[in-house]
Every structure is written in structure tokens, then in C-alpha cells.
Amino acid sequence: MRFLVGLLIGLLIFPIAIAAYLKFGQPPVATADAPLPFEAFIVHIPMHARIDRELVKTPPVGPSATNLMIGAHIYRKQCAACHGLYGLPASFAKGMFPEAPQLWEPHGNGVVGVSDDPPGETYWKVANGIRLSGMPGFKKVLNETEMWQVSQLLANADKPIPSDVMTLLKQPLDLDPAPATPTQ
């Protein structure tokens, strides 16, 4: 009987303790805070399971020179502010949590960005975004072809890319807004 009473009290106290933890601002909510235990697990395991289930194995858009160039223009406009350009990492990405990966820099085993992922996986991330990461979904911003073009660009980041595409990817972004003109 004591066990059941203890169990019942524990079942009542646990949600109250969780509510108090949340109510008094204890969870890590600032980007500089340490992650919660199992935070990466909570996001990455189900995300990869869903991607595996929904992955398009044969991309409808190939990595032609034209598609790579269009993908580079899209990347510069929609992605580079967070993910950087070739040789020009995005400085404010360091203030994000998790930090946005720089997609033109080599990482483990010399892989550049996400070029070790199939284009369909990158497409899924571009289209749907990634919760708890700051990565938005672009389904309402880009059309299907555009999402595939930028996905093919990133999937081929570790391969020879046409020189005009590479030239575009090396140009710095102009992120300084034009000065506002006074209105009367």
C-alpha cells in the first residue's frame, strides 16, 4: 500500500516539478545556453527516420551547368546569409544554436558541406526545414524545381563545379541595407 501511495505522490509531483521548471525560465532558451540532455537525439533520430521514409531517390532535376548556376543564385539569395559562401563563412551563424553549418567548408573526412548526403535528403531539408535548429522550410518560398536546383548544387559541392558558378559563389554578399531616404 505504501508503494502505491508513494507512486501516486510521485506521479503528481513530477508534472508539477516540470511545470515549475518551465514556468520559472530554467530550460535553456538562449542560443548560448548548453543544450538539454538528449536534445540532439530528440530532433535527429525522428528527422532521419522521416527523411528515410520520404526520400526521393531519383531527383527530377539533374546537376547540369544551368541548374548549378540557377542553384547558386538561389543559394546566394536564400541560404548564404546563414550557411556562408565559398571561402566566406557567415559570421552571424556563430550566434545561432545549433550553429548553422558552413556548406562550402570541408568537415570530417574532407567532405564539403552536405555533399555526402544524397540530393533527396538535402531537398527534404530545404523543403521542410529542421525544427529546433533555425533552419526554415522553403516550400512556400521556392518552387519544386528551385529547391532541387539548390539541392543539386550542395550535393555537388565537393565535385568540380563550372567556373562561372564558382565565381558567383566566391562573391561576397552585400548585406548592408541601403540607407533609408527621409520621407516628408
What are these regions (language model features)?
Residues 2-69, 113-119, 138-153, 171-184:
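Periplasmic c-type cytochrome electron-transfer domains
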Residues 68, 72, 84-124, 138:
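Gly/Gly-Pro-rich "capping" loops immediately C-terminal to redox-active cysteine motifs
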Residues 99, 107-110, 150-154, 163, ...:
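Short alpha-helix boundary/capping motifs
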Residues 56, 98, 130-133:
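Residue-level signal for pocket-adjacent positions within structured domains
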Residues 42, 46, 103, 125-130, ...:
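Conserved short hydrophobic patches within well-ordered secondary structure
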Residues 71, 75-86, 135, 150-154:
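The canonical Cys-X-X-Cys-His
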Residues 61, 103, 135:
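Short clusters of hydrophobic/aromatic residues that line enzyme substrate/ligand-binding pockets
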Residues 122, 128, 133-144, 148-168:
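Short, Lys/Arg-rich amphipathic alpha-helical interaction segments
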